[in-house]
């Protein structure tokens, strides 16, 4: 599938050699991807051989504290272009430009992954030499861009060392600068850049998976967890949806399942549905480390995970009055609440809870009392709502009535927070 990329260059290179080289780079990228370039330089909007330029503002305009009107106008033009093109990746070029930080913020807040190329701007020697010309605020913007970017693309190893030492980001990709290294050709540079784009798209799949694929995941989890061999637990719409999934979406599903620790359940659901699924490279696909790694191990049911000693002792005192399956379930719920707070909640944890609720006999009256005493009754109602959405848990297996409110939304957000 062809990747669509929107490049943002605040100022078009003024030196002829640099401008020609950048044009060649964009053309090489355009041979394998759909490339669009936005700039603030007064260039005519034009279509090159493999890319198209757009002028969205004037580089001479004031965008500082006295230029709020200009900044709002620029934001409107950029967002109009962004939603018109709907790129898969936004690639920002250049260092120490206030507008770069705004472009990154506007893109990231709307769910578009951002790749940032500082071109030596994060080299500590450059920072020391140029700091007198840079305000502390501009340096802060620069560091924040690196911290929040889906990937920082560097060509200077000293930049990478500085970024790691400052603990700004672990999402770094190093590619030799073709203008400095004789053995690095422009073709290789473009190929490596495309690989970085794909690596970015293969990371944080929970943020990018579409609704059809999400519904397919829920159906497959339900099919695997229900364990009902006497009847088909899926409706005709779910079956039709599963049979209409494209190979590209199957790849996304397996990437998402790997992030959430439910690949085994997905494979079991596929086998039960007798689906013919194409082979994918999802198992070997390269990706960047997650900012909030998901705990893909089984949900602990025999001990509390809360590190706070006082809180743990208080919960343990209340658990003493709970026995058997009810005690196991209450412990799992306390640990689920801990994972939500740590942003490490995964579908694997919800699957473990689903199996207990579905296949373990529970005294619902006694359980209701225990949940209220331990102050997790409302949390349990919210978890039941999320389980109903994520794996189609039937109301008959819910120990309490489901609740959909702002607290439930926080649990959903924890699942997709990377």
Where are these regions (language model features)?
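N-terminal subdomain of nucleotide-sugar transferases
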Residues: 1-44, 187-191
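Membrane-proximal helix-turn-helix segments that form the acceptor-binding/catalytic region
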Residues: 24, 109, 135-151
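A short, charged, and often flexible helix/loop element on the N-terminal side
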Residues: 49-77, 129-134
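An aromatic- and histidine-rich active-site surface loop
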Residues: 90-118, 122-123
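Nucleotide-sugar donor phosphate/pyrophosphate-binding loop at the beta->alpha transition
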Residues: 113-115, 123-144
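A short, active-site helix/loop in glycosyltransferases that binds the activated sugar's phosphate group
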Residues: 147-170, 189
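C-terminal alpha-helical cap of glycosyltransferases
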Residues: 175, 179, 183-209
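Conserved NTP-donor binding/palm subdomain of two-metal-ion nucleotidyltransferases/polymerases, i.e.
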Residues: 203-418
């Amino acid at each position: 599938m062809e990747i669509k990329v929107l490049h943002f260059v605040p100022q078009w290179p003024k030196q002829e050699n640099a401008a020609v080289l950048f044009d060649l780079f964009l053309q090489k990228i355009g041979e394998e991807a759909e490339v669009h370039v936005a700039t603030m330089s007064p260039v005519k909007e034009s279509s090159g051989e493999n890319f198209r330029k757009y002028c969205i503002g004037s580089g001479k305009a004031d965008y500082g504290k006295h230029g709020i009107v200009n900044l709002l106008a620029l934001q409107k033009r950029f967002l109009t272009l962004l939603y018109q093109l709907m790129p898969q990746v936004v690639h920002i070029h250049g260092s120490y430009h206030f507008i770069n930080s705004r472009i990154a913020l506007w893109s990231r807040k709307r769910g578009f992954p951002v790749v940032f190329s500082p071109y030596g701007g994060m080299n500590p020697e450059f920072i020391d030499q140029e700091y007198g010309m840079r305000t502390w605020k501009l340096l802060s913007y620069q560091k924040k861009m690196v911290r929040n970017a889906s990937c920082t693309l560097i060509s200077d190893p000293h930049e990478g060392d500085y970024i790691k030492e400052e603990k700004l980001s672990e999402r770094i990709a190093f590619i030799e600068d073709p203008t400095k290294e004789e053995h690095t050709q422009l073709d290789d540079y473009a190929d490596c850049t495309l690989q970085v784009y794909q690596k970015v798209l293969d990371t944080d799949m929970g943020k990018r998976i579409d609704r059809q694929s999400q519904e397919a995941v829920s159906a497959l989890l339900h099919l695997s967890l229900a364990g009902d061999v006497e009847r088909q637990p899926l409706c005709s719409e779910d079956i039709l949806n599963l049979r209409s999934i494209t190979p590209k979406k199957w790849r996304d599903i397996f990437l998402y399942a790997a992030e959430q620790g439910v690949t085994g359940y997905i494979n079991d659901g596929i086998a039960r549905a007798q689906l013919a699924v194409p082979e994918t490279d999802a198992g070997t696909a390269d990706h960047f480390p997650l900012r909030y790694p998901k705990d893909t191990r089984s949900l602990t049911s025999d001990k509390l995970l809360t590190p706070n000693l006082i809180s743990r002792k208080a919960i343990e005192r209340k658990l003493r009055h709970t026995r058997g399956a009810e005690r196991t379930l209450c412990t799992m719920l306390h640990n689920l609440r801990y994972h939500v707070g740590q942003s490490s909640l995964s579908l694997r944890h919800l699957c473990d809870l689903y199996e207990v609720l579905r296949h373990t006999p529970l005294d619902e009256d006694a359980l209701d009392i225990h949940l209220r005493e331990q102050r997790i009754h409302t949390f349990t109602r919210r978890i039941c709502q999320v389980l109903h959405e994520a794996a189609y848990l039937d109301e008959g297996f819910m120990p309490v009535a489901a609740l959909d409110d702002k607290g439930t939304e926080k649990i959903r957000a924890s699942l997709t927070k990377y």
